[in-house]
Amino acid sequence: MAVIEKRPDFKVVIVGGSISGLVLAHSLHQAGIDYIVLEGRNRIDPQIGASIGLFSNGSRILDQLGVYKSILDLTEPLVWYDMLTGQGDLVRRDDSLRLIEARTGYPVAFLERRQVLQVLHKHTPDQSKILTGKKVVSVRTLADGVEVQCKDGSKFTGDIVAGADGVYSRIRREMWRQAKSDGGLKHLEDDVKAMSADYRCLYGMSYPVPGLRKKSLYRTFNKDWSFLVVVGKDECCFWFVFEKLNGTHKLSNMPTYTESDQAEFVKPFMKRYVSQGVAFEALWHRKTAATLAALEEAQYNHWTYGRFVCLGDSIHKMTPNIGQGGNWAIESAAALTNKLHSLMKTTRQPTTEQISDTLIEYEQSRQVRTKEVCTTAGFATRLEAFEKFWHRPMALYVVPLAGDMLVDVHCQSVAEAPKLDFLPPPELSLKQDTIFQAVQFDQQGPHLVSRVLRATPLLALCFAAFHCLEPTGSAVPANADTEAVRLAMLSYLGDFFPIQVIAMVESARRGNSMGIAGLWPLFGLTGYWGSTGYAVPVYFFLQYILSPPSRYAASDNRLVPTHYARSAVAATGVGYLLLVAYGVLSQQNYLAGYAYWYLLPACTAVVHPLFASFLTHTTFADRVQNPRADMKYLLLSYAISGVFSGITHVYTWAPSPWGLGNILLIAARLRQGALLLEEMGPEKLIQRHHILMLGGGLFWALLHLWDLKSTGRLKAGWFKVLGALGGMLVMFGPGTALVLGWAWREVVLARKTGPH
């Protein structure tokens, strides 16, 4: 790995040989920035029973630094995730941890914290720059730098001092002292009072325990306490026992514990279950190390002042329930190095003001993201301990039914994580189908505001339809049973078939779960009471603005469960047949029967799951092993619906509404109020509905293709796109053109984007 030329005229004094401190040292080395690490303990890797969970946001940076493989050799990737009640009853078991690896390229892994420290220390290019037994007692600001004094009397100078010295950071306190002396930070007292603890935790490690599966993570939820157990390499068990304290403790009365306190603490937990058949006592009797400590929480406003800067637990302390504390420390080390590297490109001898501005940029780049994760971690701790009355039903019933939603949230967060910008991204992060690979495209796409503005014509169609079309169920004349009306209805229903198939596919797509796509039947029912001319364009508008390509950055989120993909056309066909049969039996005229077709989305919403239930459900395996398993079924569904629409279009060519005269007539009449049934004729009314709905559909498809063009994923030029869709529109009608555009989108979204 190439190292940037050294600049010995700028030096960082890193206080703390923690994970954040050593990662910062490695990062600065790669950036060509001089440093020295001062660790207060006599060894870099003390054994205190602490473990660390590595997720992709931290692993990717370690990979850039060339140390990840050595760390990975000490772990065994996790696969299984069990959620249990305090009585040991299984709430949910899934392989979400394997799905995270499939999406990110990096496995979720646990190992001893000291093992990570050992690897980082071993791979340090110049170990003479890592000094132990150097407990810092004060920092003095000089005219052109800082002077750090240690307890043994030694002093070290540099341009800045970085506090990576943990939750009770000396550097943070020295920064506060300096700021208070200068009167330089607003609301400093808020930071001084920020730390608190509502929970305590006994954490440790144990030898293998019979009954605990390899590659598994167990969570047990109960009122006021919870367990977290992870089975790592060689079946070594890492465990946490969380318990709510009696009230909130601030820094002044933060509890501390001795080894004798542990024995008293564990008594009520010994018979409580950590898995379906294993009680905590099995872990306790096989423990190799354990520590009891308060779970401090703190989100500080000020991360830097002058030549001081903090990172890791010294400035963002979260509870360990989501396993992101160490990863966030690694992120902050990378983010700080990025800013310093950018500064070094402009000057090798920056002024105090330039240094201060750079460190403030680092602070601002991290605060929003860090506040979110600290809040999430604290919420997880409280949720698992049922702190609020609604936490129990949410943890035991809502979360288990949410499917892979938690994986979605996690992956969205890590996809936005910083890396070392001056080093190439590691190959593992850019392999086929990872979110890091896909996000390179999708970050270039349009933001929400521009998406709303781009989709505004769909709302204009809705407005036009609402004011210029009357519901088809009103004032049905006696002459509605004519050949012209029949052909107009047939043309309309032929083109509606692809829309219905597409809507059913989108409602079943994994990335659209709990989204607007699932409400398609409601938009159909709205049309029953009014007009699809204004109901469907609203659906198009909402679906577009809420479904950017990034929603499907994970390839399994593009996936449509195969049992739904295989049955979409059949369900739509049966829905058509049921409504045809109803119209025949009720002996309605064509126009009155037309109103019943607004029931089609609701009808197929019932038929589709019924049909799918008779087919093999392979989603659990497909989402990890074969996220393109649905493609042949989707393309077949699109082809069948396109052919059906094209045949009806050709058959009804003479009364087709897509002539220039009809379209110009609508434009002219929009200024004249409602297009009343009595004055235009029933077949014309159907045709106007047809134009507004299918015109919106074609524009909707073009918007999605526009997204793919703007992100660089669709390579075809606009001449080719518009030529293909326009040619299909002329020859086989709008329904066929629409489904062609949608199939094109499907192929692009499913295309392998990583190196292969």
Swiss-Prot record:
One of its GO terms (cellular component) is membrane. InterPro entries: FAD-bd, FAD/NAD-bd_sf, FAD_mOase_fung. Its cofactor is FAD. The lineage of its organism: Eukaryota, Fungi, Dikarya, Ascomycota, Pezizomycotina. The chain crosses the membrane at residues 13-33, 522-542, 567-587, 595-615, 634-654, 691-711, 721-741. FAD-dependent monooxygenase; part of the gene cluster that mediates the biosynthesis of the meroterpenoids arthripenoids. The pathway begins with the HR-PKS atnH that catalyzes two chain-extension steps to form a reduced triketide, which then primes the SAT domain in the NR-PKS atnG to initiate three more cycles of extension to give a linear hexaketide corresponding to the polyketide part of arthripenoids. The active site is at residue 200. It holds the Pfam family FAD_binding_3. It is a multi-pass membrane protein. Belongs to the paxM FAD-dependent monooxygenase family. This is FAD-dependent monooxygenase atnK. It is found in: Membrane. SUPFAM superfamilies: FAD/NAD(P)-binding domain. FAD binds at residues 39, 53, 113, 313, 326. One of its GO terms (biological process) is terpenoid biosynthetic process.
